[in-house]
Curated annotation (Swiss-Prot):
It comes from the Bacteria. SUPFAM superfamilies: Ribosomal protein S20. Binds directly to 16S ribosomal RNA. Keywords: Ribonucleoprotein, Ribosomal protein, RNA-binding, rRNA-binding. One of its GO terms (cellular component) is small ribosomal subunit. InterPro entries: Ribosomal_bS20, Ribosomal_bS20_sf. This is Small ribosomal subunit protein bS20. GO terms for biological process: translation. One of its GO terms (molecular function) is structural constituent of ribosome.
């Protein structure tokens, strides 16, 4: 356990950030999975789910949770699945 006050505060803020980041990543993965499930089921709201998944990927990238190449790769694969 840290003893210095600033170190204690830093632990607290890093735990909050870790929870926030995990939540954001989970939201991105969930959006992608929802799109994939809807695609397999042949749902008619595929456009909205596709846009939501792309938006979630972009949001995760802009917040620094995933790197640019991963964002581009995920969006490319999602677009390929959407086109099929």
């Amino acid at each position: 356990m840290p003893i210095i006050k600033s170190a204690i505060e830093r632990v607290r803020t890093s735990e909050k950030a870790e929870a926030r980041n995990a939540s954001q990543l989970s939201q991105m993965r969930t959006a992608i999975k929802k799109f994939d499930k809807a695609k397999l089921a042949g749902a008619d709201n595929l456009d909205d789910l596709y846009k939501a998944a792309i938006s979630a990927i972009d949001r995760a990238h802009s917040k620094g949770l995933i790197k640019a190449n991963k964002a581009a790769r995920d969006k490319s694969r999602l677009s390929a699945r959407y086109a099929k």
